[in-house]
Amino acid sequence: MCDMLDNKLGNRLRVDFSNISKQIEIPNLLQLQKKSFDYFLNLDNGESGIEKVFKSIFPIHDPQNRLSLEYVSSEIGKPKYTIRECMERGLTYSVNLKMKIRLTLHEKDEKTGEKVGVKDIKEQEIYIREIPLMTDRVSFIINGVERVVVNQLHRSPGVIFKEEESSTVANKLVYTAQIIPDRGSWLYFEYDAKDVLYVRINKRRKVPVTMLFRALGYKKQDIIKLFYPIQTIHVKKDKFLTEFNPNDFMDRIEYDIKDEKGKIVHQAGKRLTKKKAEQLIKDGLKWIEYPVEILLNRYLANPIIDKESGEVLFDSLTLLDESKLAKIKEQKSFDIANDLANGVDAAIINSFAQDGETLKLLKQSENIDDENDLAAIRIYKVMRPGEPVVKDAAKAFVNDLFFNPERYDLTKVGRMKMNHKLGLEVPEYVTVLTNEDIIKTAKYLIKVKNGKGHIDDRDHLGNRRIRSIGELLANELHLGLAKMQKAIRDKFTSLNADLDKVMPYDLINPKMITTTIIEFFTGGQLSQFMDQTNPLSEVTHKRRLSALGEGGLVKERAGFEVRDVHATHYGRICPVETPEGQNIGLINTLSTYAKVNELGFVEAPYRKVVNGKVTNEVVYLTATQEEGLFIAPASTKVDAKGNIVEEFVEARQDGETILARREEVQLIDLCSGMVVGVAASLIPFLEHDDANRALMGSNMQRQAVPLLTASAPIVGTGMEQIIARDAWEAVKAKRGGVVEKVDNKSIFILGEDDKGPFIDHYTMEKNLRTNQNTNYIQHPIVKKGDIVKAGQIIADGPSMDQGELAIGKNALIAFMPWNGYNYEDAIVVSERIIREDTFTSVHIYEKEIEARELKDGIEEITKDIPNVKEEDVAHLDESGIAKIGTHIKPGMILVGKVSPKGEVKPTPEERLLRAIFGEKAGHVVNKSLYATASLEGVVVDVKIFTKKGYEKDDRAIKSYDKEKMALEKEHHDRLLMMDREEMLRVCALLSKASLNSDQKIGDKNYKKGQTADISELEKINRFTLTTLIKAYSKEIQKEYDDLKNHFQNEKKKLKAEHDEKLEILEKDDILPSGVIKLVKVYIATKRKLKVGDKMAGRHGNKGIVSTIVPEVDMPYLPNGKSVDIALNPLGVPSRMNIGQILESHLGLVGLRLGDQIQEIFDRKQKDFLKELRAKMLEICSIPRLANEKEFIKSLSDEELLNYARDWSKGVKFSTPVFEGVNIEEFSKLFKMAKIDMDGKTELYDGRTGEKIAERVHVGCMYMLKLHHLVDEKVHARSTGPYSLVTQQPVGGKALFGGQRFGEMEVWALEAYGAAHTLREMLTIKSDDVEGRFSAYKALTKGENVPATGIPETFFVLTNELKSLALDVEIFDKDEDNE
């Protein structure tokens, strides 16, 4: 299928092997976060997330009901600073929230204390400052740093039933139910070893479940009726009879069924079929005998009362025995609880037995008879042990636990899950529990225990949902407001007099809200430093799903099941992409086509199948909706009309693969690639790679550094374009039009919409630093005169090539050993790659220094630094800052700074020096910013911020002037273009209309009724034009005025835009208190490929560069071309990533076919265009590429030439995941490219020129350079800083630390008997302070190293002992001998 037919870009043609035309475009990869945040801030004009949160907290009343605070409305302001400013100045990109609050003062009746009316109403607007705003690139800027809030995958609220192995009794299963709210107390129901049903609230002590029911207001009889079928036993002629109910005998029958006369109608142990039961009823069986032995262990359902005295003989739930039965026989009938019925057991009866004892004790201590009140008190005591309690407080407490919307929230999702699981019909707006919920949950748990219910799988995606940024922020806001609500209530109690003077602002402290939100963004586990290495890292970071974070799992405690791939992940969560290490399986990524619905459940797309015919209707289903449906894979054979060819299809149902008839199939996968996520779908031939290697491949693509020149892969998957489309790095046209002007820094597009012409301007960003210090640079990919559509990519970002993601380079590789240098995955690289800067990347480092206001004076940024040689400051400008373009080496001064010294009385010598050299010399101390040991590069930019009220230095003024000039030029260019366009349109208008009078236009005279020539009209100036227009009809004059007005308005808009930019430029710099000047220096470093750098392919085939070989020494092909990279063939078989072999085959085909197209260009025959078209059609002659063929036929000569030039460097292929090139197609391509069928070739040794004995696999593979660069890892130290207490060298490159010589290394030296080395390690190279000083002195003077002293560790130990009040004395060995 050709992706060029609907390709918005049209810059590159790929030979696309996908089988299935894309039914729906891949949804925007970042829509989940965008939609979620828009909902939170009400950017889609519904009820916003913020409003919901406010309404859940307000109104707040005071305890005496005198005052109430109500929320009226909220309004969101505009951001004060632009994104760029926030990043440069270390600010937060945020908005202010204006909240309107109403305070009502009520009139109260003095006697009754009830509200009588309203005394006063006050409304006030309260500002909540700094609510971070999401940027258009779906990230947040917090204190100048770009961060991402990761989506959380957590357990959905609702009810869940589990079956687990008992921790106390072997081989016994324990059944539990949990009601999980979004906010509030958890409720656990659980069986114990003795089959008693208990309940726990919030993991506190368990109480029998009947205690909870009683606390909810149920009487004993009500509970029995709710849980047990009541069976009435009639006493006739000393026999116990009951009505025949076939449902009681659905399972195996425990006793013979006898009729009234004692005749056996059905024997015990035999199954009673439905047919047999109907027959028995037909035969007149109404009453059957209830065996006494069964009756003996039953319980009474209702109390038995003596009819004469009215005395209760036996209470309900009395266990029947022979003596009791003898007494009961006097009654005509009695009721028993049928605990032998289907799906019930004795759990509730056992619970009553347990709670009876507790209630008896409570009755005595509390002097209350009502069991419901006692139960409430018992629950209160369990939840708040040790607190005194009264019954009303206990009842209110139980009610608050589950039925108060302020304390308990199931959310809409939880209510939906409860209703679905328990078959309830509670309206979805009821987000608190109901009594029915609790009863039904206990009932269902009993059913589960007795094999009748369905056990839930907590890893099923129907039981896990996604909390995105909007919901996470709403939760944080709720926490902040809850804190504020508590503070307001406290303030209410302290208010006594002067209630009339109270204003809303006195009660509300908005800081509480702000700090909660800022804490979430700066310290929350889900708010992360954005991974910005390349566009892919950024996109996948924003699509990440984490099971960790607040309210989620803890990685140390997460088991294997949670981390494992679940059947419901299909099409929803990528099974490949997850980190290696302790977070494996806890951090996942959304699949490519997956969407998240309003309730937070992940949906996968399918096409509907009706009677074996695939329709074009696409449906998105959640894991729960998909249960029980038959789903066919996308690879199912379908004819041209959409009918499934084969009668039986391998379909999926609930995670199982089964053979289903085609008529039974209800859905079919949208496409094969829907299973995997974005990063995995970039790996061609993924289906041939082992899962572990695919995981490494998808993770390593995120670590690829942007290279100096990007080039798209020859073997792609078609996904490269989608990522470039949704990543913010590329510049996309906002509106369609024609490219009017383009240079390296800007693009101007002239277009026309309903209102008329307009000009859009796009600036190219250059040399910006990303979070990972990679270089961010944009360059245009359109030419002047190109027609551009809205949404089209007009400029590439980093790691992009012609609007496609390009994270690496196509390299010619050979799988062969090379003198042992590619042992253990090492990589041998040709010098040509280094010489041509193929894998060179640019990294930008930021260094900053502040000048502060100190008590002794102010620090100064200056070139005038004491005790520094002239040549050391030669590269600084007059203001003391390194000039742009300076080559920086380690130890050089980047910014000169002097700090005032505290005033000490000067010595006579100092006074003399000051008298000679002026005041400055002795007062200040050098505090300059120096380049660190590993920093080397070129200064590319400098930013200077000066506090208001302080004078700007020359450098800052120059920088300001330069930026202002650039803005003025851009504005001037746009105005010129507008003027030119206006003149052209006016001339076009007048050239079509006839004159009303004789006129001289330019050099020609025109008579009345003639039309002027457009070339003459274009020669005249504006002023002449205004007089000329009067010679035309009123209609033309009106059209002219409309045109003029439109252009006038457009110019006003441009002026307003320009003024806004100038205003931003002229804004005062905001700096932290005490800082008067901030200087940031940006240094760009070129990192060429070096020995020790890590490289990788896309299939998890990683390695370290082991040697760089001269081009002449590398093995070469028969045509003389030498190989770029030699890889070890042993890296393939055991790793099982065969995808790399297929990729290199297809890559070689692309190169060879490209060479053939280049030959046609080189020959440049008369009809070479025909030859080119024929060649390109030949390449697309494979049946699967019919659409490409049609497309190439439809191209104009100019377009064809454009695509052919691109193909001459290598024909680009697109082999989507699971739809790659097959064997037959490979053999056709090999023939076309004139490659041997085994894909191998003869090679010659570069050093000897001899032919290598075996034929070698040579191909073209896409290689990446990863950000584990040797330059950033290599580190050496001779002397340096030491730890304060232990006096041992500090550790780590960042602190310029030493290499740790640990316990095990000491053992190694002991084993070798290397005593002197060992002594040196433990003393002068570690913590012998005097020893190391004298050793250093001796070495510098060329003397012998003196004897070592006592290590500091010894003193640390003795001082530790002294701190324990132990007197420790140290004796010298020599003194001891005396």
Curated annotation (Swiss-Prot):
Keywords carried by this UniProt record? DNA-directed RNA polymerase, Nucleotidyltransferase, Transcription, Transferase
Task: Please name the InterPro entries in this protein's record.
Answer: DNA-dir_RNA_pol_bsu_ext_1_sf (IPR042107), DNA-dir_RNA_pol_bsu_external_1 (IPR019462), DNA-dir_RNA_pol_su2 (IPR015712), DNA-dir_RNAP_su2_dom (IPR007120), DNA-dir_RNAP_su2_hyb_sf (IPR037033), RNA_pol_bsu_bac (IPR010243), RNA_pol_bsu_CS (IPR007121), RNA_pol_bsu_protrusion (IPR007644)
Quick check: keyword Transcription regulation in the entry?
A: no
| Gene Ontology CC annotations of this record | DNA-directed RNA polymerase complex
Task: Kindly indicate whether the keyword Transcription belongs to this entry.
Answer: yes
The secretion signal range is none
Top-rank EC class of the record's enzyme: transferase
Assigned EC number: 2.7.7.6
Q: Name one GO molecular function term.
A: DNA-directed RNA polymerase activity
One GO term under biological process is: DNA-templated transcription
Query: Which family is it part of?
Result: Belongs to the RNA polymerase beta chain family.
Q: How does it assemble?
A: The RNAP catalytic core consists of 2 alpha, 1 beta, 1 beta' and 1 omega subunit. When a sigma factor is associated with the core the holoenzyme is formed, which can initiate transcription.
Please explain the role this protein plays, according to its UniProt record.
DNA-dependent RNA polymerase catalyzes the transcription of DNA into RNA using the four ribonucleoside triphosphates as substrates.
Q: What is this protein called?
A: DNA-directed RNA polymerase subunit beta
Q: Which organism is it from?
A: Campylobacter jejuni (strain RM1221)
By which gene is this protein encoded? rpoB
